Amino acid sequence: MIIYKDCITEDEMFSDIYKIIETPDGMCLEVEGKVIQREEGAIDDALIGGNASAEFQEDDVGGSSLTSGVDIVMNHKLQETGFTKDSYKNYIKDYVKQLKAHLEKTNPERVNTFMKGAQETVKKILGNFKNYQFYTGERMNPDGMVGLLDYREDGITPFMIFFKDGLIIEKC
């Protein structure tokens, strides 16, 4: 399994169990999820990577509460946050500076391409600002990446957008 983490906070943002598409401009990854329901405290079997034990079957006793939400958010403990358009502009300006500094250390030849592409990507984000819900990593570090949640044209399929250059890949 591959885990994608925020390069600044090292918070887990998503994994390769989802459909992942690179945007045509190469700046972002779109991660497609599903709206799910889960019992409070239950662990999704899809995250375990094995088969459920035949020896122990839990009875549905009732009384447990169901929560529903987007699987990417629930499985990776992303935390919803809020922005006005102006506060997002301030955040993204600082975040792009941090990513530039990160790239200067880790991938200097990518810096110019990233800076040009980031301007266009931010314009697109601001143009669709009202469509997004915003999520940080589990630690809610304000310096870290903010994933953008939107829905496909069908109005049912959720997807999240993450800056590709803000992610580190960890194989488990």
From Swiss-Prot:
Keywords in alphabetical order, please: Calcium, Cytoplasm
What Pfam families does UniProt report for this protein, alphabetically?
TCTP (PF00838)
Subcellular location as annotated: Cytoplasm
Q: Which Gene3D superfamilies match?
A: Metal Binding Protein, Guanine Nucleotide Exchange Factor, Chain A (2.170.150.10)
Which InterPro entries does the protein's record reference? Mss4-like_sf, Mss4/transl-control_tumour, TCTP, Translation_control_tumour_CS, Translational_control_tumour_p
Outline the extent of the TCTP domain: 1-172
Q: Which residues form a coiled coil?
A: none
- Any GO CC annotation of this UniProt entry: cytoplasm
Per the record, the major location class is cytoplasm
Question: Which molecular function terms from Gene Ontology are attached?
Answer: calcium ion binding
Q: What does this protein do?
A: Involved in calcium binding and microtubule stabilization.
- Of which family is this protein a member? Belongs to the TCTP family.
What is the name attached to this protein's record? Translationally-controlled tumor protein homolog
Species, as recorded: Xenopus laevis
Which lineage do the record's taxonomy fields give for this organism?
Answer: Eukaryota, Metazoa, Chordata, Craniata, Vertebrata
